[in-house]
Amino acid sequence: MNTQARLTSTQWKARFKGYVQVTKPGIIFGNLISVAGGFLLAAKGDVDLVLMLASLVGLSLVVASGCAINNCIDRDIDAKMQRTCKRVTVTGEIPLSHVLLFGIALGVLGFGILALFTNTLALLFAAIGYVVYVGIYSLYMKRNSVYGTLVGSFSGAVPPVVGYCSVTGQMDMGAVILLLMFSLWQMPHSYAIAIFRFNDYAAAKIPVLPVAEGMAKAKHHIVLYIAVFALVSTMLPLAGYTGTAFMAVTCATSLWWLTMALKGYRQDVDMPRWARQVFGFSIITITALSVTMALDFQAVSQTPLFTLVR
C-alpha cells in the first residue's frame, strides 16, 4: 500500500509538472515584467494595486492559455525537434484533450478577470493578441510562411500595451510606441533563436528566415531590426513619457546589442554561439527597459488616438 501510494504521489507530481510546462513559465514570467512595465509607466506613481494585480494575473492566464493550446497545435512538429520532442503533448503523458481543455479554462479565467477589472481597450488588445498567436501564427503562419515571425511579433508586443491601457483606457502615443518597440524587439530575439536552433527548425520544416532564406539574410535582418528598435525606444523619452534615465539605459543597452549583432559579420564567427549571445542580451535589454520605464515615468499629457472605456 505504501509503495502504491508513493507511486501515485509521484505520478501526480509528474502530471502537475506537465501541466505547468505546457504553459511555458519562462514566457509567462517575461510577459509579467513587460505588463508591469507598461502598467507602471501609465500609472505614473498613482498605482491602483487591485487593478495592477488583476492585469498581471489576467494577462498571465491568457498567455498561459495561448501557450497550452499552441502545444496542442504544434505536437506534430514538436516531435521532430530535439528541444521539444519530450513535451507531454508529444509523449502522450497527458492526453491532448486534457491539455486543450486546460488551455481553454485558463483562457476563460484570464479573459474573465480582464473583463471584470480592466477596461474594454485592454480586453480588446488581449483578445486580438490571443487570436493572432493561436489562430493566425500557430495554426498557419508558423508552418507556411517566412513572415510567421513578423506576425507573431505583434502578439508578443501586446502584454505591455494591455498593462498600459488597463490604466489609461485609451490608445495614445505612449501605447503606440510600446507596441512598436516590443514588436521590433521580438524580431532579432526570434531570429537569434532560429539560428542557434537551426537544425531543429530545418528538421521540422518550419520556414523561419535562416532556414528559408539563409543565415546571411537573417544576420542582415537582426542588425536592421536592432537599429530600428534603438531609434523607436528613444521616442518614449523624446515624447516626454520617460526621463533621462530611460534615455541613458535605452541608448546603452541598444548600442551594446547592436555592436554585438555586428560581430556576426566576422569571417571567423561561431554562428550558434554568436546567436546565443544576441538572444541572451535581448532579454537583458528588454528587461532593463521594462524596469526603467516603470521607474522613470513622466507626467506627460496623454492625447488619445481613440478611447474605449468600460
From Swiss-Prot:
GO terms for biological process: heme O biosynthetic process. PANTHER family: PROTOHEME IX FARNESYLTRANSFERASE, MITOCHONDRIAL. It is an enzyme of class 2 (transferase). It comes from the Bacteria. GO terms for cellular component: plasma membrane. Pfam families: UbiA (PF01040). It catalyses: heme b + (2E,6E)-farnesyl diphosphate + H2O = Fe(II)-heme o + diphosphate. HAMAP family: CyoE_CtaB. It is a multi-pass membrane protein. InterPro entries: Protohaem_IX_farnesylTrfase, UbiA_prenyltransferase, UbiA_prenylTrfase_CS, UbiA_sf. NCBIfam families: cyoE_ctaB, PRK04375.1-1. Converts heme B (protoheme IX) to heme O by substitution of the vinyl group on carbon 2 of heme B porphyrin ring with a hydroxyethyl farnesyl side group. Carbon 2 of the heme B porphyrin ring is defined according to the Fischer nomenclature. Its main location: membrane. Keywords: Cell inner membrane, Cell membrane, Heme biosynthesis, Membrane, Transferase, Transmembrane, Transmembrane helix. It comes from Shewanella sp. (strain MR-4). The gene is cyoE2. Its EC number is 2.5.1.141. This is Protoheme IX farnesyltransferase 2. GO terms for molecular function: protoheme IX farnesyltransferase activity. Belongs to the UbiA prenyltransferase family. Protoheme IX farnesyltransferase subfamily. Pathway: Porphyrin-containing compound metabolism; heme O biosynthesis; heme O from protoheme: step 1/1. It is found in: Cell inner membrane. The chain crosses the membrane at residues 25-45, 49-69, 98-118, 121-141, 145-165, 176-196, 222-242, 245-265, 277-297.
